[in-house]
Amino acid sequence: MNEILRKSYAELKSSLSLGKISATELATACIERIKEVDGSVKAFLSLDEKRILDAASESDARRKSGNPLSEFDGMPIAIKDNICIRDSITSCASKILENYKSPFHATVIEKLIAKGFVLIPRANMDEFAMGSSTENSAFQTTRNPFDLERIPGGSSGGSAAAVAASMVPLALGSDTGGSVRQPASLCGLYGLKPTYGTVSRYGLVAYASSLDQIGPFSKELQGCIDLYSVISGKDERDSTSLNHPGFSAPWTPDFKGLKIGTIKMTSEIQPEVVKAYEKVLNQLKEKGATLVELDFSKFDFAIPIYYIIATAECSSNLSRFDGIRFGSRKDKTGKLEDLFVDSRTTGFGSEVKRRILLGTFSLSAGYYDAYYGTAQKARVLIRKEYDSFFSKVDFILQPTSPTTAFKVGEKTKDPIQMYKADIWTTSVNLAGIPAISVPMGTDEKGLPIGLQITAPHFQEGKLFGAAQAIGALEDLNIKFPENIG
């Protein structure tokens, strides 16, 4: 591996600013690393070397003339394949969009380009972001760099694996029910799900519009802080975008007097995850924090509520992919109805079809009130329960995932078990609050374990402060693999 990629994110940012390395050198190192290990990891669906190197060359020219766009000018970043980049294929890892080239940039892409970031698309994902393992991609299964027989998490598995394998220092993903936090946990990274509405969704191909949110990955907390500061902000093109106070610097917590909400561990949780969680809690208690065990019994139905709402929105959002408005066309008989059926049957994978059917059922005339209407009422109760929690505690700490990375193929035939991987993440999306996954050590096999920190709406600054303090605790650092494959 090129020595440049052994530098931390902070060192890379400093080296670019001081001229110790050029953007072209850094981009070339990333390309070489991708060629070296991605045959095994399969984090990227394509690699446009010319476009990457051209962007890096432009960055170098700006720095040489003394006019860098920002301190980030020349920094490479991987982009998930559901975030639109003009004149680049945005397939959402689906055959139905296999040849779709976006005619416009997503808002987050415009913001990254305005700061001089070097974009490296297209990071693999579960098809249309529907999955928790990146096994639902129509093109390839991404592997966990820590163990190639295991999954990296999903749906943003390609983004997470690319950072964990040191192919890129940063990445963007999307999080609908845990799709940034869960792969961050399984790949030993920091992964942020911002408050809903603080980051524009314009140009993010929608899965479930009331739940989707774009978020960053990094090996270091500072990478997430920097990316959030760049991509957040109100956007008139996104009707759900909000004005928010932002933050000037991460809040520095004093553990003495800090009230931290915790969750009771059960026998269903991997013992090593429980051990790591309790170790963190004990360290926080020793530093003066007060631990408050919260009653999460009302969240037992969070996953079914999530899957009713998410699949309902998915069935609506994906109706546009019919072979006429969007998507590849399969016209065997010349009949309009057959065109719709054939295009969608051949274009969508099995998990996408399953969720479309579930959503269509819950929205049907005879069942709308019983399912979708009831789920929306229950969603309000979840939001109120979080409000109640945060009147008692400053933060809530939970393991991000109940297990470390499982083996490829282990849960593909049991969707219920796969859905349970998001047991602690979906409720955060239902409530629209921010959460971040931070590394919490490893299990006996060396597989990463993640800790989810949750805060009230718009409290990203405090969330980063808590993540910074917890990240400084003993024995939580992750050693990332260099020799892969």
UniProtKB/Swiss-Prot annotation:
GO biological process: translation
Active site location: K80, S155, S179
One Pfam family hit: Amidase
Parts of the chain that traverse the membrane: none
PANTHER family registered for this protein in UniProt: GLUTAMYL-TRNA(GLN) AMIDOTRANSFERASE SUBUNIT A, TRANSAMIDASE
Family per record: Belongs to the amidase family. GatA subfamily.
Biological function: Allows the formation of correctly charged Gln-tRNA(Gln) through the transamidation of misacylated Glu-tRNA(Gln) in organisms which lack glutaminyl-tRNA synthetase. The reaction takes place in the presence of glutamine and ATP through an activated gamma-phospho-Glu-tRNA(Gln).
Subunit structure: Heterotrimer of A, B and C subunits.
Identification of the protein by name: Glutamyl-tRNA(Gln) amidotransferase subunit A
The species this protein was found in: Leptospira borgpetersenii serovar Hardjo-bovis (strain JB197)
Lineage: Bacteria, Pseudomonadati, Spirochaetota, Spirochaetia, Leptospirales
